C-alpha cells in the first residue's frame, strides 16, 4: 500500500512520465484486476492521509489533521485487523506518526521527516530498535 503515489507515476495509466520508472508489477495487478480512474483521498497531506489509511477514519476522528499533530494511538489500525486474520504484516519507509508502528510483525521506518542521507530507522528484527543506514 502506498499513501503518497501520484497516478501519473504508474505505467498502467499511460502517462508519458511513467516511462521514466516503469511499474511492471503494478501494471500486472491492474491488467488482472481493476484500475481506479476516480479515486480520492480524505486528506492530501502524507501523514494525515497515512493515518486515514491505517485507521479507516477521517482526520478529525483519528486525531491526525495536520503533520504536527499526533494520531490517536488507541484507535485500531488496519494492520492489527490483518494480523488478527492471520496475515503477516510489515511496513518500511516513512512512518511520521507520533506512535510506534503497531500491528506489524516487522517494521523499518523513518520516525519523522528526518534526514535522507545516513538516516536512522526505527526497526524490529536483528538490528534492535534503531539502525543507521549509510547513503541515500
Per-region residue spans from a language model:
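Formylglycine-dependent sulfatase
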Residues: 1-136
